[in-house]
């Protein structure tokens, strides 16, 4: 039997698999509870399974898709996990405590192909997509590390990679994470952030009710294309049309993320352009002062410019928050993930 990873299976797929090896379908629900409820480290811990079934699992089904290579913790409590993959690549995930919430930022790719100019991850280039198991296991491994001390309450696809460029694996991972017989995460507590791959954005709206965040960072095409090459393929008018058509539950809004770059996109004129761009969309805005990293040509704007930009949006009745950097001293802040080991 070719080895498989249990975390690659949705529950219906696992039910089909266990029936294929001669077991009854309810065994799949037992496995989900052991893997995601109890966090077992070995199939031998599953004492309610027959010895023969456990032997089959031990010889053909892997429990983990990745391993923790390194963990760093910042003074503010933010933790960065470096994970090793079986092919030698590595990725990072970040746990951000903000009581009573504890948010895990997960990666969806090794590297990223989009090449956003302000993002250190983009400088790595694209290596490969993650499997569903490699996405799910980031959640499992961090929760295993936390133990009974704390629970992950929110998951955000804002780590390494563009989630919509790996949508098949991301949707499969979300189905596993949200499965009531497993981790039972509410879709309301899962957020996916995208630079704006429009066809995949439309598919996401049809297939998964997770929260949507759009990385915007400029309100006019020329500047956005300079900062984010994806804008040349899907310019703002195309992206915003897709956002206007995106299916939103009552009282839900799309989050628009806007990194403030000193002297680039942070003046009052651009705030007005952003207000105009968001007209007619149920939107909220997260402003993020740039997190400096080695080799970057961009600078963090002054607090005065940040607050002035926020005020301009709030005066237009757009809910606007300033997201303060977390974990910057360990390279865990937004746009800083590079998965270096050493």
Swiss-Prot record:
Major place of residence: cytoplasm
Coiled coil: none
Residues covered by the Radical SAM core domain: 98-329
CDD domains, sorted: Radical_SAM
EC primary class: transferase
Binding of [4Fe-4S] cluster, residues: 112, 116, 119
Catalytic residues of the enzyme: 92 (proton acceptor), 334 (s-methylcysteine intermediate)
Any Pfam family matching the protein: RlmN_N
Cofactor binding description: Binds 1 [4Fe-4S] cluster. The cluster is coordinated with 3 cysteines and an exchangeable S-adenosyl-L-methionine.
Disulfide bridge map: 105-334
The keyword Repeat appears for this protein: no
Annotated positions binding S-adenosyl-L-methionine: 161-162, 193, 215-217, 291
InterPro entries: Aldolase_TIM, Elp3/MiaA/NifB-like_rSAM, Methyltransferase_A, RlmN_N, RNA_MTrfase_RlmN, rRNA_lsu_MTrfase_RlmN/Cfr, rSAM
Miscellaneous notes: Reaction proceeds by a ping-pong mechanism involving intermediate methylation of a conserved cysteine residue.
PANTHER family: 23S RRNA METHYLTRANSFERASE, RADICAL SAM CORE DOMAIN-CONTAINING PROTEIN
Protein name: Dual-specificity RNA methyltransferase RlmN
Species assigned in the record: Syntrophobacter fumaroxidans (strain DSM 10017 / MPOB)
């Amino acid at each position: 039997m070719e080895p498989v990873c249990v975390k690659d299976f949705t529950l219906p797929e696992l039910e089909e698999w266990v029936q294929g090896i001669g077991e009854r379908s309810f065994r799949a629900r037992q496995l989900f509870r052991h893997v995601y409820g109890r966090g077992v480290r070995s199939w031998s811990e599953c004492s309610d399974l027959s010895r023969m079934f456990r032997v089959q699992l031990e010889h053909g089904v892997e429990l983990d898709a990745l391993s923790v290579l390194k963990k760093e913790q910042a003074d503010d409590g933010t933790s960065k996990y470096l994970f090793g993959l079986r092919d030698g690549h590595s990725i990072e995930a970040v746990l951000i405590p903000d009581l009573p919430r504890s948010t895990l930022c997960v990666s969806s790719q090794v590297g990223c192909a989009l090449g956003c100019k302000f993002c250190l991850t983009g400088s790595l280039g694209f290596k490969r997509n993650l499997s569903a198991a490699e996405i799910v296991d980031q959640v499992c491994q961090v929760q295993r590390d936390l133990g009974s001390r704390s629970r992950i309450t929110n998951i955000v696809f804002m780590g390494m990679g563009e989630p919509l460029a790996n949508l098949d694996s991301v949707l499969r991972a979300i189905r596993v994470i949200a499965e009531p017989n497993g981790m039972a995460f509410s879709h309301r507590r899962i957020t996916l952030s995208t630079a704006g791959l429009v066809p995949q954005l439309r598919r996401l709206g049809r297939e998964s009710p997770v929260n949507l965040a759009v990385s915007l960072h400029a309100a006019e095409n020329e500047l956005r294309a300079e900062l984010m090459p994806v804008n040349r393929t899907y310019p703002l008018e195309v992206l915003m049309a897709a956002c206007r058509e995106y299916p939103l539950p009552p009282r839900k809004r799309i989050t628009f993320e806007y990194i403030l770059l000193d002297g680039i996109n942070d003046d009052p004129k651009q705030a007005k352009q952003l207000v105009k761009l968001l007209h007619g969309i149920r939107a909220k805005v997260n402003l993020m002062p740039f997190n400096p990293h080695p080799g970057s040509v961009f600078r963090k704007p002054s607090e005065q410019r940040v607050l002035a930009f926020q005020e301009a949006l709030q005066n237009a009745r757009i809910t606007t928050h300033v997201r303060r950097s977390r974990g910057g001293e360990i390279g865990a802040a937004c746009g800083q993930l590079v998965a270096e080991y050493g």
